[in-house]
């Protein structure tokens, strides 16, 4: 999401406001320390331009606010800037384990069946169990899904898949326990129930949202109509997708070299 947003800002948004992409400084506030590394990946460049310039974690932002004596919790609420200022409940639940899966299922159901989803909540993917699996019925078309969070659970799930013990059509994996709400850049907290509380807050935001399906966001609809042409278009793929390469050999080689020095 970080890189997709930044890519759109430095193309579509830049065009809208009449500013050169290289003159925009894009700063993202994230719960994830890995996002700092993500922005350095060469595969994330768009037309040779780095789309996200800086990443500040939520904990770092909190420290900045305290350093400047900004009463963060007392700041008045205000709307996000437009274009791209509208959000949905589906976007909010991305922050908790199972949220990406649930958001995708809300849209997938309606795209596949052509009908409104009678119940938006997919309880099968909610909760903090390390691995959750379910079979979802899209009006006769059944898909097997799995959700895993925390690398020990992820490793176990992937091993089962490789060994042929399990098969899924769609898998959501999050490295941090609890999902983004448990990210390495989040404020440190000694409350044992903090993840449950953060999770409940996110689902509450979703429930109170006027728009709860990703594909209903008017800004996204407008973005595709005016700029990206259609979902999965060449332009959308160029700006919103990336690719990865197998680095295992290089990592093993570096590890051996490190051990030989010791």
How should these model regions be labeled?
Residues 1-262:
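Iron-sulfur-associated redox domains of electron-transfer enzymes in respiratory
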């Amino acid at each position: 999401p970080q890189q997709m947003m930044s890519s759109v800002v430095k193309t579509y948004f830049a065009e809208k406001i009449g500013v050169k992409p290289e003159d925009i400084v894009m700063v993202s506030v994230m719960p994830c320390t890995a996002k700092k590394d993500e922005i350095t990946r060469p595969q994330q460049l768009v037309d040779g331009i780095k789309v996200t310039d800086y990443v500040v974690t939520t904990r770092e932002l909190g420290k900045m606010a305290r350093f400047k004596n900004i009463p963060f919790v007392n700041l008045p609420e205000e709307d996000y800037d437009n274009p791209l200022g509208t959000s949905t409940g589906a976007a909010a639940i991305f922050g908790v384990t199972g949220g990406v899966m649930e958001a995708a299922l809300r849209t997938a159901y309606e795209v596949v069946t052509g009908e409104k989803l009678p119940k938006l909540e997919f309880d099968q993917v909610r909760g903090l169990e390390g691995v959750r699996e379910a079979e979802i019925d899209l009006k006769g078309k059944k898909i097997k899904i799995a959700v895993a969070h925390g690398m020990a659970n992820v490793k176990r799930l992937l091993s089962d898949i490789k060994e042929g013990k399990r098969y899924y059509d769609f898998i959501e994996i999050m490295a941090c326990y609890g999902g983004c709400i448990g990210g390495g850049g989040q404020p440190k907290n000694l409350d044992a129930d903090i993840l449950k509380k953060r999770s409940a807050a996110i689902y509450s935001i979703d429930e109170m949202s006027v728009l709860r399906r990703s594909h209903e966001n008017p800004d996204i609809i407008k973005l595709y109509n005016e700029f990206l042409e259609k979902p999965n278009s060449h332009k959308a793929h160029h700006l919103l997708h990336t690719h990865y390469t197998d680095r295992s050999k290089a990592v093993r080689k570096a590890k051996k070299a490190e051990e030989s020095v010791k």
